[in-house]
Amino acid sequence: FIDGNDKAVSIHSPQEAQKLGISTVYQEITLCPNLSVAENMYIGRSNKIYQNWKKMNEDADKILQNLDIPAKASQQLASCSIAVQQMVAIARAVDMDCKVLILDEPTSSLDEQEVEKLFGLMRDLKARGVGIIFVTHFLDQVYEVCDKITVMRDGSLVGEYAIKDLPRVQLVSKMLGKELDDLSDIKGDQPTEQKSESEEPLFETKDL
């Protein structure tokens, strides 16, 4: 549902998606590192054409401050950390009246502190009414920030579940397509360490 509209739509381009209020931030940063933060926020947007650089930077700084993003509009994007670059991409989406934000593996290149900063921004956006689709393979993060889990396997939908109703072991079971008993068998089949009581070498090499 977007603004109460439950009708299926056919989307053929990113521009069409953006008009519907759907924006995506990809795993690989798709911004221009040689441009400023503000330029990246407004580039390619016909509804945001600035003739005044000062005004553009002021507007961008307001958005960055409002979202508590530690960056200046005038600084070069390349000088920002990967986490901040992703936040700038999110700020761009929010300023485009984004109602649904798709985050594709946003934490894959971040350290723990950067992940927490990103999660703080995600929680803030959630409080503002922005729906977030968080694509990740880090299960700990799923249980930390998500309300629902959608499981897909081999390109097909397995199901959608509330976080509180799906223990982690059951999630793994659904992801792998195996019953819980099968998972127990797999765990039990792990090789155990074996030690020889004999002092005779089992393997030797010389003159390598």
What positions do the PLM features span?
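Glycine-rich phosphate-binding loops of nucleotide-dependent enzymes
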Residues: 1-208
